[in-house]
């Protein structure tokens, strides 16, 4: 209707037999809902210049567009990133898993990634970004102005620091981390 998508379902398979599902529909409040599920997220992430050397993973994407503003969440589980900044590589050396990841050349492993962002016109505001892995965790926020400026601030934390912090909590630390 009026050159707008009101309902679309795409079920597809990559050449490696991994699934890709895309759903777009307009709800009763005239909000456009987009969902993507992919067992092969690399082709979907290749246009993001700040994500390089991505391998593996399963991607879930959910977006609601109201008027000209979209609020979105990307979740990715069980993946590796091969090209990371030098500081992140140094911090991964603080754990045995990080050393193993770097020595194999396969990249730094992450168990979970979540990105919550809002887009309007050419501005993407990153409300929350986190990636948690056995060697390092990353938390960020900021914004990306299309074809112009990227401003991100956040924290890189070696996993050993997180484990020590949790371990120092009486009783709870013994249960979660052990001795």
Predicted ranges, named:
Residues 1-157:
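Solvent-exposed beta-strand/coil patches in large extracellular/periplasmic or lumenal scaffold regions
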Residues 157-179:
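Surface-exposed, gly/pro-biased binding rims or lids
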């Amino acid at each position: 209707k009026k050159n707008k998508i009101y309902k679309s379902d795409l079920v597809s398979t990559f050449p490696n037999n991994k699934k890709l599902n895309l759903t777009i529909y307009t709800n009763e409040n005239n909000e456009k809902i987009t969902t993507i599920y992919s067992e092969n997220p690399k082709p979907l992430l290749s246009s993001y210049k700040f994500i390089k050397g991505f391998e593996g993973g399963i991607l879930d994407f959910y977006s609601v567009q109201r008027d000209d503003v979209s609020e979105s969440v990307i979740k990715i589980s069980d993946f590796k990133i091969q090209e990371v900044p030098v500081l992140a590589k140094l911090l991964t050396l603080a754990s045995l898993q990080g050393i193993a990841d770097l020595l194999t050349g396969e990249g730094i492993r992450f168990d979970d990634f979540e990105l919550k962002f809002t887009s309007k016109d050419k501005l993407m505001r990153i409300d929350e970004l986190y990636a948690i892995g056995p060697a390092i965790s990353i938390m960020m926020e900021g914004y990306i102005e299309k074809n112009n400026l990227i401003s991100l601030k956040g924290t890189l934390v070696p996993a050993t620091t997180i484990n020590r912090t949790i371990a120092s909590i009486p009783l709870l630390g013994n249960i979660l981390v052990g001795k």
